[in-house]
Amino acid sequence: MTSEAATKFVYTTYISTTPEKIWQAITRPEIARQYWVHQNVSDWKVGSKWEHVRGDDGSVMLAGKVIESVSPRKLVITWGEAADYPNEAKHTRVTLELEPIGEMVRLTVTHDDLKAGSDMASSIANGWPRVLSSLKSLLETGKPLDTWAQPKGRINQ
């Protein structure tokens, strides 16, 4: 990220599951596809490339590098448009932290190095809550949410 004004997005949720199940849901493409529609593909080793692959046509939407991988507690990756993969200055950073608390897990996602006011920052603020709500539903009920559905008509009062 360049020296332009930066911002970050932080989202915390509590999921009635284990850190291992959340880790698998994030890192195994066949599970990620269920709640994210797309899949995350990598060997998840430090220094490896990861790709966010569309479930419908297999095209790579996003790509980055694995910075830190401590299964099942912490994953840090860079994040950028697939075309920008070679240019690390255009990458943002995502940190996923999993902390067991009794019979649940506190999952905190911090997406930083975002350019303040950018389309990416806006997209992130809209996207992460949808993805993580669907992940929570899948792990707690066995069914993901269709968080990308359009709202039904509202009644004007």
Feature locations, PLM:
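Hydrophobic ligand-binding cavity/cleft-lining segments
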Residues: 1-41
